[in-house]
Design a protein with these regions (language model features):
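Hydrophobic alpha-helical signal peptides and transmembrane signal-/tail-anchor segments
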Residues: 5-19
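Acidic, surface-exposed loops and disordered segments
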Residues: 18-243
Length: 243
């Protein structure tokens, strides 16, 4: 009799738990979908980087190497609002000249991207390529403005901010580029900006193969492309230190 009673109690508990799960499953569908979507994105990021198993630590050295200026992006990958917000939010943690914190940011998602694309220029050293190539345009941007007139302290903040945001983009599996060649007045009009735009960051999933190379004997610092690879000349580490 004791065994039969135990089995009946066990069956009753199982029935209650199953009913509870059935009732709450429908309420959790959206949460589960979002969770699975994020996990799939993390998996794609690891796969694209040739990783397997545990994701390696995002050290500063790795992020700096990954943080290359991409001028071509995967058109099938649409940058989300929360990703841009996460990138912008690093500005609440970084240094600021005189602690003025005068920079403000206008995120631009895919539905407004064309309003930016019409007024920017990429690849100034490769004008014959007319970058970005058709079908590789970025679909998300961050417009950086200042609440005060531009000066040397604002420019210091601008550099710190841009690099910090691009490193954050690299950490979450994205790429970007700083764009200074754009029509400021048209951008300001298109987005009804209260303040003058100083810089634009394009954000997306870069598709270009980019390699760093030492500056040659001729001293040429212009980037160039050969056989599908984008080469960026850099000063040798041993030449950086003043002796």
């Amino acid at each position: 009799h004791g065994k039969a009673l135990f089995l009946r109690v066990l069956f009753f508990v199982f029935t209650v738990v199953l009913r509870y799960l059935c009732i709450h499953t429908s309420n959790r569908t959206d949460m589960a979908d979002n969770y699975l979507e994020r996990k799939m994105e993390e998996y794609r990021n690891r796969t694209a980087a040739g990783q397997s198993g545990r994701r390696p630590l995002a050290t500063l050295g790795r992020l700096l190497l990954k943080n290359r200026s991409h001028r071509g992006y995967d058109a099938n990958f649409i940058v989300r609002e929360d990703q841009l917000r996460r990138i912008i939010e690093v500005n609440a943690k970084i240094p600021s000249a005189r602690n003025q914190q005068v920079l403000r940011f206008r995120p631009v998602l895919s539905d407004e991207a064309q309003k930016v694309l019409a007024h920017i220029r990429l690849g100034g050293a490769l004008p014959h390529l007319h970058l970005p190539l058709p079908g590789t345009e970025p679909n998300a941007f961050i417009i950086v403005c200042s609440t005060v007139e531009e000066n040397r302290y604002v420019d210091i903040d601008l550099g710190i901010s841009a690099q910090s945001m691009l490193l954050q983009a690299a950490e979450i599996g994205l790429n970007g580029i700083c764009i200074g060649a754009f029509d400021k007045e048209r951008i300001r009009q298109e987005f009804g900006l209260e303040w003058e735009p100083l810089l634009i960051l394009a954000i997306g999933r870069g598709i270009e193969k980019i390699e760093l190379v030492p500056i040659g004997a001729d001293g040429d610092r212009n980037y160039y492309r050969e056989n599908g690879t984008h080469y960026v000349p850099k000063v040798r580490p041993e030449e950086l230190t003043i002796k």
